[in-house]
Amino acid sequence: MSNVLDKTNLHELSIAPKISTHDEKLYECTKCGIFFHRDSVESATEINPHENLGEVRAVEDKPNNESIKVDERGTCNFHFIDEHHGKVDGINTEYDASKFKQILENYSKLTEPNQLFECLPSNLRPPSDDEGSDGKSHDPQSNGLGKTDYTVPTIIPPTVLPVLHDLAQQMVKAGHQQELFKTYRDIRRAVLAQSLEKLGVERHSKYDVERMNQDVFEAKIMNWIHYIRISVKLLFAAEKEICHQILDGVEPFRDQSFAEITTISFGMLLSFGYAIAISRRSPEKVFVILDMYEIMIELQPEFELIFGSKPCTEMKEDALNLTKLLAQTVKETIADFEVAIEMDATETVVMDGSVHALTSYVARYVKFLFDYEPTLRQLFQEFNSNDPDTKLKSVMTGIMRALRNNLDGKSRQFEDAALTQLFLMNNVYYIVRNFRREEAKNFLGDDLVQTHRRIVQQHAKQYQTISWNKILQCITVQSSKSGLIKNESIKKTLVKEKFKTFNSQFEELHQRQCQWSVSDVELRESLRLAIAEVLLPAYGSFLKRFGPMIESGKNSQKYIRFTPEDLERMLNDFFQGKNLDVSPKR
């Protein structure tokens, strides 16, 4: 409904003022466009909220040339002279202080949650029972960061607001501004508190928060995010709107009233945020605290607009302080996480050399942080406004370094040096694999990703050296030093010994390393290929050169147990994490 009503609309609503005939001079009410006679308007009749508001008539108004203003002490700055001794054209204009309270109480009802949900953008409304949820992944759009439209709810019928405004002006003129202030504040404050209580807002202390299990903790925070968004964007916005209409021109009571109406409710909302921020920190909490930080950033324009007046300064500062405290909590929690990684002393031994639980946990943790990249950049800008990107990359580098240091310590639990290298290769590669995507490079920096790739290659080469150099020596003949060549012939016994040693060592490697695990298919295949490229040509050359000498004798299969094809097939068993038959299939 428009704030401007013409005379026709007024007559249709039956609240048109009755113009006196003894004075033809009219004045215009600049706020609503209604024309009043300078000396008189019709006094209000009793209000019954169950009857049509059209029966409500305008309250007696008798202004002079001065506008109504109230100073800081609540004192009116004009003199009111009733020339007609309480009568205007025979109409009773005696002031009745109960009308304002009666109408305000009758039309001030709590706003039901469903009404509020209807005022939200569709993507922020609670899902219906049959819609379900599609997971917990963080989506900035779903948290209200996108451009979305909100509809301020109607908390008092628009047709009642001009009536309340006129009554409020009457009370001020009669010198009852303090009664007006107290009546309006108490009624609206109680209704606002009831609306928030019906919505689900409740007070929690730091100790309440620390006793919550993780699921309850997260649910409470997600509810709080919805509550504070609804409260600020809908309830507080609507409250300020009607306050400005009803108490228009009654400064400073208007802003002071709004401040005192909302301060308790807003304080209760913020108290939960403060309780979260100062409660015991843990790495798992950082994501929901980031969600809280995001909503506080999202609501900053509303804080500036809704709490922009001087009486609301403290509320605006409390909101800003909570935002900073949440940012500090996130920063300190991530720093704690880095320390916790390096100090992790879990004795879980990964016997097959596969990815350790700590590695998968850290990688998953950092991947979740990727989803908050814009938020983290903004957050770190509060602490390093010159270069938040460098600070963010430094934090991520510290986490990766802490993980590698811890893995180095855990790798010492293996007695087999080759398994140590395989374990480190697996774990560092797991990080690289999870950080391939472009967002990760932007988040961590390409240098960090490339550094970890080189570390993977180093561990792979060290594994090959430790595992395969010894066996390759069995099938390598150096004529100048070995002493095996004499008169262009090789003694069969020495050749047989070399074959036997090779067979024994390969079977041992096969038996042991087929139980080791390289879970990533790409890494597993590349490692097998690297082994095959060295082993198969060397064995093939040795077999081609010395095989005929053994095959010409008895029991040749005792010494030549494998063909190059057998070795290639058996290499495919490596790193499967299984117990396999080591006998070659001929």
From Swiss-Prot:
Q: What else is known?
A: Associated with natural variation of agravitropic root growth upon auxin transport perturbation with N-1-naphtylphthalamic acid (NPA).
What UniProt keywords apply to this chain's record, in alphabetical order? Auxin signaling pathway, Developmental protein, Exocytosis, Glycoprotein, Membrane, Protein transport, Transmembrane, Transmembrane helix, Transport
Whichever gene encodes this chain, its name is EXO70A3
- List the top taxonomic levels of the source: Eukaryota, Viridiplantae, Streptophyta, Embryophyta, Tracheophyta
Name the source organism. Answer: Arabidopsis thaliana
Name under which the protein is recorded: Exocyst complex component EXO70A3
Q: Which domain of life is it from?
A: Eukaryota
Q: Where is this region: Disordered?
A: 119-149
Share what the entry says about its subunit structure, partners included.
Subunit of the exocyst complex.
Q: Which GO terms describe its cellular component?
A: exocyst; membrane
Q: How does it sit in the membrane?
A: Single-pass membrane protein
Q: Name one Pfam family in it.
A: Exo70_C
Care to name a GO molecular-function term for this sequence? phosphatidylinositol-4,5-bisphosphate binding
Could you tell me where this protein is found in the cell? Answer: Membrane
